[in-house]
Amino acid sequence: MGETVMKMLAINPISLKKRMTEFLFDYLFILAYLVLLFLGSMLIYIIFFNGVPEFTEIQSQWLVFLTSILPITLLFTFLDYKNDGSFGKVKAGLELVYQKKTVQASLIRNTIKFLPWQIGHIGTIHGFYSEFDVLSISLSISATLLAVLLLAMTMFRNDKRHLGDLLAHTQVQLKGD
């Protein structure tokens, strides 16, 4: 099956309102997942462990990665690849276009997109175990700066592409453009 090569727009007409709509719906979806994850985890902890068990820092890092970051990254990778966009993109009338549509491109894009979240978790979890030493604070600041950079790129670049889009050769466009 031959893949269609899509054109990247040098001047992308997506409005800030459409991007904020996309971000809001994706945020609400992720928040709902995290609330269900919390409730399910607490239920399991209460039923099987008589309360929340003690975890080492490494166990906490893996638990957070495997239950929140990895599933969300893989789900958004799937949605971007299969449906040309996340729930937020669909709701906002946007779609993800690829220079060459591959699962790898979608995974690269979403890994970069959720990297600030993962770095933030690493810093915060390390902070709980280290009384917020220089490393944990540095990681938390780095996560925030990277998130701001990615958001600023989607808002202020003429092509509206963030670092993940540049590396994956993708672009969010108005649906049907």
Features from the language model and the residues they span:
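Membrane-interfacial and juxtamembrane segments of integral membrane proteins
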Residues: 1-177
